[in-house]
């Protein structure tokens, strides 16, 4: 297994390609908004979102999911429930990706104990050919992107506040991604995952 950490060039122009495929692969856009706007967005999303603590079975017990979650529809009548700040964030995403996003899922990582295990997005809940757009706010956190089959490459990247990560639909077949726990002192982070869902899909 080979691990590739990315040290970003702060003066780089345009996106950084982490993984390549015929649908755009995985591209990282650092600093799509400045620090002041990213900080304001973080505070607004944190305070205006109806966060939920989900639980899940694990072996012989039920445990808390290690993060808070929420989700909103971006279109239709259900979009009225969306905090206004999300429309502003969605417009920024649209400036970098013209996919017709229909839903946004939010994760609130309160500290280094909160995480998400390696996974790929459920392809049956996505419209093929459209990417997933991930906006990061708050403290930086490392994402691990792991190839499922040999040579099982691992790409590690610190997702900075105000950044955008685009992951192709095709990438979900071949790679998992996750946010591991960390023992280092880190502040809270919010991620917003924009997706294109089939009609009548109520997921995030």
Where do the model's predicted regions map?
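Non-heme Fe(II) oxygenase metal-center motifs and adjacent flexible, charged/small-residue loops
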Residues: 1-204
């Amino acid at each position: 297994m080979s691990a590739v950490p990315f040290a970003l060039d702060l003066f780089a122009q345009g996106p950084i390609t982490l993984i390549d495929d015929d649908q755009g692969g995985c591209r990282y856009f650092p600093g799509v908004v400045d620090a002041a706007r990213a900080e304001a967005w973080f505070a607004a999303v944190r305070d205006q979102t109806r966060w939920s603590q989900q639980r899940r079975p694990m072996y012989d017990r039920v445990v808390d999911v290690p993060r808070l979650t929420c989700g909103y529809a971006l279109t239709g009548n259900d979009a009225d429930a969306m905090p206004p700040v999300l429309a502003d964030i969605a417009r920024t995403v649209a400036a970098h990706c013209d996919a017709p996003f229909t839903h946004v899922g939010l994760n609130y990582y309160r500290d280094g104990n909160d995480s998400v295990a390696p996974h790929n997005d459920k392809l049956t809940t996505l419209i093929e050919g459209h990417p997933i757009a991930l906006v990061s706010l708050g403290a930086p956190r490392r994402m691990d992107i792991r190839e499922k089959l040999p040579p099982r490459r691992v790409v590690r990247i610190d997702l900075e506040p105000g950044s955008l990560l685009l992951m192709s639909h095709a990438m979900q077949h071949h790679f998992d991604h996750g946010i591991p726990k960390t023992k280092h002192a880190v502040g809270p982070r919010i991620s917003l995952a924009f997706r294109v869902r089939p009609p009548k899909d109520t997921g995030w």
